[in-house]
Amino acid sequence: SKYRYLLWIKKILRKMSKIRNAITKIHNEWRCYCERKKLKYTDFSIISNNCWGGLIYQKFGLQYTSPTVGLFILDEDYLKFVEQLDFYLAQPLKFIDPRMSKHHDYLYREHNKEITYPVARLGDIEIFFMHYHSKEEAEIKWKYRTMRLNRHRLLIKFSQRQSNTTDVLDRFAAIPLRNKLCFTPLLYESSQCNFVYIEALKQLNIQGGDETPFTLEAVDICEVINNLEEE
């Protein structure tokens, strides 16, 4: 009958979907394996002001060994965070109503709506857990990923997204950590840090969007990781 025929078709389509998903998974795992083979070691950690760090872990198929995954911290707060990294990582997260954020007006203009994801204060800075469903999830993952952090092989990455002056770049360059990488829409040089000019950030900082493809075109991330100095 027509009904049985339709059921048969649906069954075939479900099987095809499972096969396609399995092939995609195998392909992704193989791609990650090939990328990992380019690395000298895989026990590095990335502190990042946005989702970039998490995407690098995903590129290599590695476990997250940093709390700064799936979230963002605005420029000024991020500089405070990395200037006193040990201090802030020892502070408890205190979740707040997003409408009480000191950055509420800025974020409302950016999103054109109220934000609904978890927001927490860490001392006097604020962290926006953009890719988390609840405060509980955000807090649990923040804690155990902080415990995984490898402080001896640490990449401190900063993308200049909200600020547009060299003052923040001066501050970032002065942070007494060995492995610093900064993507900026400004022309800036320093012997204390690897500053990478990304013209696309000028537009991204106005319209929003993912910086990752542009940054990975500008730097060889395998080379960056392979040349990390031990802290």
For the regions a protein language model found, what residue spans apply to each?
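Exposed alpha-helical structural elements
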Residues: 8, 18, 77-80, 144, ...
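Polybasic, proline/glycine-rich intrinsically disordered low-complexity segments
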Residues: 186-231
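Membrane-proximal basic amphipathic "stem/tether" segments
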Residues: 1-41
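Short, surface-exposed, polar/charged, turn-prone segments marking secondary-structure boundaries
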Residues: 73-79, 182-187, 208-211
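Extended, basic/helix-rich recognition subdomains
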Residues: 145-195
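Surface-exposed polar/charged interaction patches
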Residues: 6, 12-15, 29, 88, ...
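Positively charged, amphipathic N-terminal segments that serve as targeting/anchoring signals
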Residues: 33-35, 39-42, 48-154, 158, ...
